[in-house]
């Protein structure tokens, strides 16, 4: 859409660009109107990167420095460690220099810098700026070597010693609080929370479902863990307003409560593609030509600190594998369950997965194959794949190639020979 905008206030830059927009169906933002364009669009820039960082840059922010300084504690917690250490070192050094200058001025005005003067000094043994600076360090850090000390000759010197002690305590408290807050941030907890590299679409309980997998690499639990997802897609409203990133909620069981998960072993999050889903009208070919991004979010409290953490990732349209399922990772042993994370990102192709949209499937425009034959074909596919990998020594792949001449609405299923069948969970 960016190619048809010449300035920030116009949508159509010329008559030719207007004709281009007229060929697009903008009713729901996915190009599912009467005129469809099945050319693969240029891969969009991610709004949320795979590691969870948002791909956003702020420009032309008014009074940015003042706003950040007004919230200096959050600024210190958010910045990198090296800048944090630089700021804290400067805070100490500048405070020592400031009070060193104050004590040097007191000594200068009182005449303590004159070695021939025999009167009582405000600060004993402070007869130069270096001595005043060392006295400032000893006062703020409570070192107290004993050579330099304040006397009762000058009340202003006594007041400055008390004031510097208070300032030193405030700086220490601020630094300790900021360091502890930065160390306790649950941001690093996200390093042990992982999402699958690809999302998949396959049949589950007779319905097309969008699925992705999430896992916890630590044995410590994520308390009150729950998931949510949004679909980001640019669209044009019926009034002609261009929305670069329209956010549409994807239901993962919020109403029924199944969005709350017990994340001990890897779990597959399921979004049922029903009439309320933004993917309801999309077939495999539509998704192959679509330009959208699905942002997935996992939230919960870290068990050790009780602080809330949020882990994010995203899937572009070309990262959604149609007709695939995830390989099993949880296996039951004699006295425990074993999780094999080497299979976490691997998928296998499911035969006879409908290539039509969920709407066409609901309206009976697609003939589903027998469920038993599905289980048998699935078993054969997995068995042959494992045999080939063991013979050739080739790692398992997640091929997404599909025969090009398959009809989206009428796929014939070849009847299989009678064989003893096994459940899919036993494969």
Swiss-Prot record:
The record marks 172 as: Role in the control of polyamine-mediated channel gating and in the blocking by intracellular magnesium. Residues 181-208 are annotated as: Polyphosphoinositide (PIP2)-binding. It catalyses: K(+)(in) = K(+)(out). Keywords: Cell membrane, Ion channel, Ion transport, Membrane, Potassium, Potassium transport, S-nitrosylation, Transmembrane, Transmembrane helix, Transport, Voltage-gated channel. Its main location: membrane. Residues 384-427 are annotated as: Disordered. Pfam families: IRK (PF01007), IRK_C (PF17655), IRK_N (PF08466). InterPro entries: Ig_E-set, IRK_C, K_chnl_inward-rec_Kir, K_chnl_inward-rec_Kir2.1, K_chnl_inward-rec_Kir_cyto, K_chnl_inward-rec_Kir_N, Kir_TM. It is found in: Cell membrane; Cell membrane, Sarcolemma, T-tubule. GO terms for biological process: cardiac muscle cell action potential involved in contraction; magnesium ion transport; potassium ion import across plasma membrane; potassium ion transport; protein homotetramerization; regulation of heart rate by cardiac conduction; regulation of membrane repolarization; regulation of monoatomic ion transmembrane transport. Residues 1-81, 179-427 are cytoplasmic. GO terms for cellular component: membrane; plasma membrane; T-tubule; voltage-gated potassium channel complex. Residues 129-140, 141-147 dip into the membrane without crossing it. Activated by phosphatidylinositol 4,5 biphosphate (PtdIns(4,5)P2). The modification S-nitrosocysteine is found at residue 76. Homotetramer. Homomultimeric and heteromultimeric association with KCNJ4/Kir2.3. Can form heteromeric channels with Kir2.6/KCNJ18. Associates, via its PDZ-recognition domain, with a complex containing LIN7A, LIN7B, LIN7C, DLG1, CASK and APBA1. Belongs to the inward rectifier-type potassium channel (TC 1.A.2.1) family. KCNJ2 subfamily. This is Inward rectifier potassium channel 2.
